[in-house]
Amino acid sequence: MTNIQALFERIAPLYDRLNDQLSFGLHHVWKQMAVDWLELPQGATALDLCCGTGDLTRLLARRVGRQGRVVGLDFAAAPLAIARQRSDHYPQIEWLQGDALAVPFAPQTFQGITIGYGLRNVVDIPQALREMFRLLVPGGRAAILDFSHPQTSALEQFQQWYLQQWVVPTARHYGLAAEYDYLWPSIQAFPTPPTLCALIQQAGFERVKHYPLLGGLMAITVAQK
């Protein structure tokens, strides 16, 4: 088990509560935006990589309806167990423990793919992007939601302050300070928007659009095969 995998096993029971508190509920809006930008029709097939407790997965299921098919994949068992408990009303969802770098499906299986706050945590970002490209049908779209690099130095300073002075102390209240302390260095190591878009194009995608949120504190990047 990797360090990141073990981290998500530990934080799973409180992950959603902390997301609500730390984003003031805005993560729900951003996840819905990511799903909407895929423009999936009813009956479509979709994949949610690094699905965690399944917020995005369930939004995809609502989008494609009961005639569609959605797979939620994560490498950690604990968040998947929570996701399964919450999916009684979503028979179109299949939950799967697996690796985002080697997804066990044939090429051109899915019409849409989401990955929310997951690409930053994989050990090989280019390989994850190549897998998304492989799995999509021609014309299919992938939506990547994650922290990003702010557009101004003032916002970057705010981002660092917010993470170190609000996020980590809030997590400390739940005994998870060490688990959330990794966020700031992980964001610093994440590709900048131009680099990320270039990596997506190198993976084979033809159209890439980057949408900064809150001045670039967060972003959704949409790529079409």
Swiss-Prot record:
One Pfam family, short name: Ubie_methyltran
Enzyme class label: transferase
Pathway as given in its UniProt record: Cofactor biosynthesis; phylloquinone biosynthesis
Keywords: Methyltransferase, S-adenosyl-L-methionine, Transferase
Catalytic activity: demethylphylloquinol + S-adenosyl-L-methionine = phylloquinol + S-adenosyl-L-homocysteine + H(+)
Gene Ontology BP terms: methylation; phylloquinone biosynthetic process
GO-annotated molecular function: 2-phytyl-1,4-naphthoquinone methyltransferase activity
Protein's job: Methyltransferase required for the conversion of 2-phytyl-1,4-beta-naphthoquinol to phylloquinol.
Family that this chain belongs to: Belongs to the class I-like SAM-binding methyltransferase superfamily. MenG/UbiE family.
Protein name from the UniProt record: 2-phytyl-1,4-naphtoquinone methyltransferase
